[in-house]
Amino acid sequence: MPQTEQIHQHSVLRDIIRSRRSIRKFKQEPVPSAVILDMLETAKYAPNHRVTEPWRFIYVSSETGKANLINTFAAFSKKSKPDMTEEKLQNFKNTLGRVPGFLLVVFQEDENERARDDDFAATSSLIQNLQLLAWEKGIGMVWKSGKILYDKEVHQAFGLQDNERFAAIIQTGYPDEAPEVKKRTPIRDRFTEM
């Protein structure tokens, strides 16, 4: 490949990385599962020590699937915050109801701590690849985490095995609005040469 093309491709990639935003407000149309699958086929080329490919995915975008997810997440919220009012719980459910699709990223937890760390890092790299590919296609995502990722009842609701857990819950759809770029610390302030 000629050097000028390499520079141009680098510039396109740099622009995608710098412009990508976490999207929290979506249009109602879900992203077709074929588009999600296509992006995952490319995203899977994330660095992965020993090529274990520890991941699998659950895409929830049907009305029935979303209703089950919302009820499962609401039950978890009520259990983890017993003083949550019915009004706050309903607001939580309404917020989830406005999300057109959820991609649940699952990975196998190796018994070996180092292998487990490697696999989680690989899965996280895949997720970032996916977010960049989505942004390039005009698809928005927000990567969610928290205590819900570790809850055994939530695991059971989605058919996770004993050696699996969630790496992320990714809300996905076509952006209704994108937030402004947030100021980032110059990397020189966090860079040491030895």
Swiss-Prot record:
CDD domains: YdjA-like. InterPro entries: NAD(P)H_nitroreductase (IPR052530), Nitroreductase (IPR029479), Nitroreductase-like (IPR000415), YdjA-like (IPR026021). It is an enzyme of class 1 (oxidoreductase). It comes from the Bacteria. FMN binds at R20, R21, S22, K147, I148, R188. Keywords: Flavoprotein, FMN, NAD, NADP, Oxidoreductase. One of its GO terms (molecular function) is oxidoreductase activity. The keyword Ribosomal protein does not apply. The keyword Flavoprotein applies. Its cofactor is FMN. Pfam families: Nitroreductase. Disulfide bonds: none annotated. Its EC number is 1.-.-.-. Belongs to the nitroreductase family. This is Putative NAD(P)H nitroreductase YfhC.
